[in-house]
């Protein structure tokens, strides 16, 4: 998704905070809300905040909203974090590769398996790579990911956006809801400071417009966009 946002960005450099123990003064109201105290993670747009710190900061995010929007979900479902429609393992693997390659140039962390997954040494090699922080993909998954990566990099608007000197990637955003006094959070894939564009990179099993449109609603990406809309408009 590429959307134009209106935000005067003041960035907070949080690259030195790499573990949750670096921010153990976060004050969270476990029962009534999701408030991050003034001595914890600051409200604003963070550059370099680790994914661990972002995920451990208890605040309302898009996943919570997507789960809450489904009337069949109880609070137990929401707390367990299983309200989302499950993404197939293969689709998730492709998405991880595309995200890492396009936004972070980390293609080297993914390898292609040339045999079948039924071979005994597939799992053994998968575990070996996991210990090194790498991921093993099947030949079909790897080739599908390469096709998606090439499509993004060959897109003129995306090429302009990714290469722009004012584009900042992997931002963590925390804001306070003025009505309900709750902390909201979002982790944006990339934001262009100069032009006010926000990008969230999504992969889909098919690029056919009708299939992609259905997937957007099936996986609650429309609600995720609405969550970002609250942040920035």
Regions flagged by a language model, labelled:
Residues 2-185:
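Metal-dependent nuclease catalytic cores that hydrolyze phosphodiester bonds in DNA/RNA
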Residues 164-233:
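Mg2+/Mn2+-dependent nuclease catalytic core
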């Amino acid at each position: 998704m590429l959307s134009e946002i209106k935000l005067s960005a003041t960035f907070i450099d949080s690259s030195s905070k790499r573990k949750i123990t670096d921010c153990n003064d976060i004050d969270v109201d476990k029962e009534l809300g999701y408030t991050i105290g003034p001595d914890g993670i600051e409200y604003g747009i963070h550059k370099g905040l680790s994914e661990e710190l972002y995920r451990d900061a208890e605040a309302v995010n898009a996943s919570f909203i997507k789960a809450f929007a489904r009337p069949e979900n109880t609070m137990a479902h929401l707390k367990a974090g299983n309200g989302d429609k499950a993404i197939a393992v293969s689709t998730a693997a492709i998405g991880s590769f595309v995200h890492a390659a396009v936004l972070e140039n980390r293609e080297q962390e993914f390898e292609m398996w040339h045999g079948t997954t039924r071979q005994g040494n597939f799992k053994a090699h998968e575990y070996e790579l996991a210990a090194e922080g790498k991921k093993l993909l099947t030949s079909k998954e790897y080739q599908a990911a390469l096709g998606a990566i090439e499509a993004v990099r060959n897109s003129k608007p995306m090429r302009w956006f990714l290469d722009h000197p004012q584009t900042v990637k992997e931002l963590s955003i925390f804001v306070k809801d003025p009505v309900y006094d709750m902390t909201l959070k979002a982790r944006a894939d990339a934001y262009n400071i100069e032009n006010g564009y926000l990008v969230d990179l999504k992969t889909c099993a098919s690029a056919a417009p009708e299939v992609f449109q259905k997937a957007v609603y099936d996986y609650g990406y429309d609600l995720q966009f609405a969550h970002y809309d609250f942040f920035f408009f």
